[in-house]
Curated annotation (Swiss-Prot):
A GO biological process held by the record: lipid catabolic process
Organism: Talaromyces funiculosus (Fruitlet core rot fungus)
Binding site for (3R)-hydroxybutanoate trimer: W307
Known catalytic reactions: [(3R)-hydroxybutanoate](n) + H2O = [(3R)-hydroxybutanoate](n-1) + (R)-3-hydroxybutanoate + H(+)
Name used for this protein in its record: Polyhydroxybutyrate depolymerase
Catalytic residue positions: S39, D121, H155
Keyword Heme part of the UniProt annotation: no
Field pH dependence: Optimum pH is 6.0.
Lineage: Eukaryota, Fungi, Dikarya, Ascomycota, Pezizomycotina
Disulfide bonds: C70-C79, C169-C180, C234-C241, C250-C304
Signal peptide as annotated in the record: 1-20
Amino acid sequence: MFDSVKIAWLVALGAAQVAATALPAFNVNPNSVSVSGLSSGGYMAAQLGVAYSDVFNVGFGVFAGGPYDCARNQYYTSCMYNGYPSITTPTANMKSWSGNQIASVANLGQRKIYMWTGSSDTTVGPNVMNQLKAQLGNFDNSANVSYVTTTGAVHTFPTDFNGAGDNSCSLSTSPYISNCNYDGAGAALKWIYGSLNARNTGTLSGSVLSFAQSGSYGANGMDTTGYLYVPQSCASGATVCSLHVALHGCLQSYSSIGSRFIQNTGYNKWADTNNMIILYPQAIPDYTIHAIWNGGVLSNPNGCWDWVGWYGSNADQIGGVQMAAIVGQVKQIVSGFQG
């Protein structure tokens, strides 16, 4: 159990990284798991929410992502910028794979789904997000869906506070986190989980833990270290907690921007007052040229999550190596459930 494992706690992630330790188990209800992400992390969140809807059984959130399986049957750039990628074959694949290569699509009718786009996003714009909404509309319950557009926002993670080094809402550059006067993390979590306690806007009670993304918890294109935010209420194991997975976008991994995605997106503020652990898996730049879906070749120098088939033809299906690693992390964390 968690409190019997020696771990290295980081009060704040600084320039010096504490050596990663084994990923502990926590008293987390396995029926309280969700995921969200930005950009390639948004694509990955949709992949996990669809392919592993039995694991991410509360719901998922997508910030500036696109349709599930989008890049398999059209070149990946069709799924970017602000075009209208075809969802005909991807949606047909969801139906034909249901219950085999992916979990049953019937699950999606029971999941809470949150989607966000910036009206001025030219990297993965509103038209692409609209196609995701249309695709999921074949399976979801519209009463369970929230779709939000922030006027003037670009390709960024939206917050309502000024984190150190963050941008204005109209600026799409590193660290791709911006004060848009919109609490994206809070909006996603409140939609997915329902009513929550007010966030902690002061000093947080919890700590950040680094863990080894190795063995079944790691994969091609993933860094050797991942992170968890654990509120004080979840640390001892006395309280049953929930789990949310927060996925960074391209150029947002720890190797690119340090701890900013972990500290500045606002997830931890909500987790701290709601008995919620936040898991931050980490991708890493990969300069090797790989074959991708649809016959192309591409390297991954921006440390994106795999939404184009870099690491296998089954990248968005059960057993896709990055998804399997993240699911392995989730299953280890919830294995300490005492209910």
